[in-house]
Amino acid sequence: MAPVAAATGWRLLLVLSAAGLGAAGAPQPPNILLLLMDDMGWGDLGIYGEPSRETPNLDRMAAEGMLFPSFYSANPLCSPSRAALLTGRLPIRNGFYTTNRHARNAYTPQEIVGGIPDQEHVLPELLKEAGYVSKIVGKWHLGHRPQFHPLKHGFDEWFGSPNCHFGPYDNRARPNIPVYRDWEMVGRYYEEFPINLKTGEANLTQVYLQEALDFIKRQQAAQRPFFLYWAIDATHAPVYASRPFLGTSQRGRYGDAVREIDNSVGKILSLLQDLRISENTFVFFTSDNGAALISAPNQGGSNGPFLCGKQTTFEGGMREPAIAWWPGRIPAGRVSHQLGSIMDLFTTSLSLAGLAPPSDRVIDGLDLLPAMLGGQLTDRPIFYYRGDTLMAVTLGQYKAHFWTWTNSWEEFRQGIDFCPGQNVSGVTTHTQEEHTKLPLIFHLGRDPGERFPLSFASTEYLDVLQRVTPVVQQHQKTLVPGQPQLNVCDRAVMNWAPPGCEKLGKCLTPPESTPKKCSWPH
C-alpha cells in the first residue's frame, strides 16, 4: 500500500472503530477536547511525583489513559506555543516570533500589532471539513485586533479573552482586558469579571468550566461532533482561585489554583461519562509552557527535576505534563516514551477526524495515534527556539545546546531569576553564550536536570554529535521562516474599543497611532 493510501486507510479504520461502525454504517468521528493549562509545570501533578498529591482527578485520568513524560511545548512562552498547537507548525514558520535576537519570543502584550496570519491553516478551520462544531473557552492570545478574532479563524463559539489577565489598569494609559462572548465583548477583567489580587479570589475557572459543560451538553443533544479547546488562564500569575478552593492546598495560592483545575477536569470527564460519550471523545491535557519559577513559590509551580522554567529553553521551560484519555480506545495505565510536542495535537486531531494534514506546507506535528493505540514509537527531533534562534535540539535521550542563556545580569541583580536556586556553572548563563561549534550535550535519561554535560573528548559525545549535526543542518537548510508577527508595537491597537463596547458603555478613546519596533527584553 502506498504511504498516502496507508494513512488514509488508517484514519478510516480509526474513525469506524471509534464510532463502533462497520463499513455499512455512517462514520461518526470522535469528539476532540484539548485542555490547555497556562504556566502549569511538569511537577505540579501527583502522577509526576508532586509530594502533596493534590490532583486526584488528573492522576485518575492518567491511570485510565496514557501518560507522556517526554512531551514538549514549541516555545517557552504562551503565544508562540498556542500558535504552534493550532497550526501544527513551529513559531518560526507560522510567524509567532520576533527578529530581536534571543528575545523572550513574545507574550503578545496589548500593543502588539500582529497576530495569526490568514495564510495559516488553523485547526478548527480544517475540522469543519469533517462536520465539527468548535469552541474556544479562555485565552486566545493569537492577536486581539479584529482580523485575528478566533471566529475568523474557524471557531464557531468563543468565551474568553484575547490576552492574559494582567491588570488592573486605569483605562487611560492602558485598558483592562476585555472578555468576549463570540463576536462582542461582555465586560473586562477587574470590572465585570473581578480578580482580587490581595486575596486571590476570582471565579473565572468556574465560569470557564460552566462554558465547557454547557457546550458539551448542547453538542451531545444535537448529535454533532465537537472540538472544544479549553484554554483557561489558570495557573498564570497573578494566580487566582474561587472561594471554595482558597486556602485548601498545602502549596499556597498556586496550589489552590491547581486543585480547582483538577476538580474542573474531573467534572468535565464525569460529564462525558454521564452522557455516555466518553468512548467517543478524545481528551488531552497539557500546558503551554513550563511553570514560571520567577513567580514561585506562591505564584508559580514546579517543574519537577528539570532545570529552570518558563522563558528558557532548558527542560523546565519546555517539558510539559501530558495525559491522553480515551476510554476503550487508549489502553489504560500506560506510559508512552514517544517524544511528543504540542504541535502533535494538530496532526493527531486531524487524524482523529479522518483528515490529512495540509500538503502545501511543512507540518511539524506528528500523529500520535500509532503511539497511543499501538505503542509504536517514531524517532523525531524536538527543536527549541527562542526568538528566531535555534537554541537546542533533542534527539532520543540526548539534548544538544547551541546557545545557553537564562536572563540578563541586569535583571538578575534586580531579583528577576528564571532559575531560582539552580545555578549550573557554564550552563545557566546570564549572557548569551554560543556553543554552535561544540554544543553542550546532555543525556536526559541519566541527567534530566541538565547539570552534567558530556565530555567533549568522550566517544559518546562524538557519536551523538555525528547524529545531531545532519538533523540540524537539514532543518536549517530547508527552513523558510514566516513573516514575523511580533516585531511591531503600537499603543493605539490596544483593547480600547473592542466590538460590543458601545452596548456596554465601555468604549475608550485610543491614543494617536505611533507604530514602532517592540522593545523586547533580553
UniProtKB/Swiss-Prot annotation:
Q: Name one Pfam family in it.
A: Sulfatase_C
Which modifications occur after translation, per UniProt? The conversion to 3-oxoalanine (also known as C-formylglycine, FGly), of a serine or cysteine residue in prokaryotes and of a cysteine residue in eukaryotes, is critical for catalytic activity.
Q: Provide GO CC annotations from the record.
A: lysosome
Reaction(s) catalyzed by this protein? Hydrolysis of the 6-sulfate groups of the N-acetyl-D-galactosamine 6-sulfate units of chondroitin sulfate and of the D-galactose 6-sulfate units of keratan sulfate
Query: What's the superkingdom here?
Result: Eukaryota
Q: How is the cofactor bound?
A: Binds 1 Ca(2+) ion per subunit.
> What general EC class does the enzyme of this chain belong to?
hydrolase
Which CDD domains does its entry note? GALNS
Please give the cofactor(s) recorded in the UniProt entry for this protein.
Ca(2+)
> What is the residue range of the signal peptide feature?
1-25
Subcellular localization, as worded in the UniProt entry = Lysosome
Q: Which residues are glycosylated?
A: N203, N423
Q: Name the positions where Ca(2+) binds.
A: D38, D39, C78, D288, N289
Per the UniProt entry, the disulfide pairs are: C308-C419, C489-C518, C501-C507
- Positions carrying 3-oxoalanine (Cys) are C78
Q: Which SUPFAM superfamilies match?
A: Alkaline phosphatase-like
**Which segments carry the region annotation Catalytic domain?**
27-379
Question: Main site of residence?
Answer: other
Q: Where is the active site?
A: C78, H141
Q: Which GO terms describe its molecular function?
A: arylsulfatase activity; metal ion binding; N-acetylgalactosamine-6-sulfatase activity
Q: Which UniProt keywords apply?
A: Calcium, Disulfide bond, Glycoprotein, Hydrolase, Lysosome, Metal-binding, Signal
Q: What is its EC number?
A: 3.1.6.4
Describe its partners and assembly state.
Answer: Homodimer.
The entry assigns this protein to a family as follows: Belongs to the sulfatase family.
The protein here is known as N-acetylgalactosamine-6-sulfatase
Biological source species: Canis lupus familiaris
